[in-house]
Amino acid sequence: VSLWSLPFAGLLLSIALLPLLTPHFWEHHFCKVAAFWVLAFLVPCAVAAGFSIAAQAVLHIFLLEYVPFILLLFTLFVVAGGIKVSGNLVGTPGTNTAMLAFGTLSASFLGTPGASMVLIRPMIRANQDRNYNIHVFVFFIFLVANIGGSLTPLGDPPLFVGFLKGVDFLWTLGTMLAPMLFVSGILLALFYLIDRLAWNRESSGVKAKSAATRQIRVEGLHNVLYLFAVALTVLASGIWHRDATFPLGLGIELPLNGLVRDVILVALALLSWRTTKRAIRREMFWLTNSGAKSSLALKL
């Protein structure tokens, strides 16, 4: 293993372990920890290869990989956050399993952040009266926030970085479809068994609510069109290969297709923000107050 990979390994281990071992320290100093590992790579790189090479590497990664990566996440976050699913769903084993299955399948097209944002609110509401619900959100993280995004570059951020490097848009779909369905099927079956056992322990009052007629309401449906536009924009940027570039100095050139893609993504995010009712977005955790949060508190 190359010594150059050690700072990256250290960063991953810090993200995985420090929140568990020293949560207070991590909460207040995670930026400093990240900066430490960045410098642990950059300083030796500048000494060994020269300052210009190190600066070129940083600018290349930042402008051609990190910025497009963040812009895609930002757009999916804003657009998916404008879709609100509400109703009187009760978190029965069948309902929870169906919601997890839908979220898993949609995550590759909404993105794992987008699918999680769309489904977490109805999932919380459906299970807020249950006394045994921790496992629901553990499997939600496994399926919707992780495995579900394995089929397209839209689904999982690292796959999008691979797409920026030249990996075909549909390569992951052909390669990962069978493994994804196999693993998801096992987890969904396991979840249903666990949730059925937990449901049998619930009070009669909770079970009685499941007999009511289901009513589901979806607001902000126009954002689905924006999501399709996001998918088409990313796909087109991979198909449209143009030689035109913008020189940025230090040997870095910004491809025209990437620039057009990023501008369109930002425009779609702004359109979604302007055309979606603010009341829908106020219910998201990133715009809500502590009182609204407490109303959705889980019985853990």
Residue spans of the language-model regions?
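Interfacial loop-to-helix junctions that mark the boundaries of transmembrane helices
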Residues: 1-4, 25-34, 54-68, 169-179, ...
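Intrinsically disordered, low-complexity non-transmembrane regions of multi-pass membrane transporters
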Residues: 1-4, 8, 39-43, 194-227, ...
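Hydrophobic core segments of alpha-helical transmembrane domains in multi-pass membrane transport
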Residues: 7-18, 37-48, 73-81, 181-193, ...
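C-terminal ends of transmembrane helices
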Residues: 13-26, 76-91, 124-127, 191-200, ...
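Transmembrane alpha-helix boundary signature
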Residues: 20-24, 42-65, 74-92, 105-118
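Hydrophobic transmembrane alpha-helices that form the pore/transport pathway of multi-pass ion
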Residues: 94-147
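Juxtamembrane and boundary regions of transmembrane helices in multi-pass small-molecule transporters
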Residues: 132, 151, 171-212
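Transmembrane helical segments that form the transport core of multi-pass membrane transport proteins
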Residues: 227-300
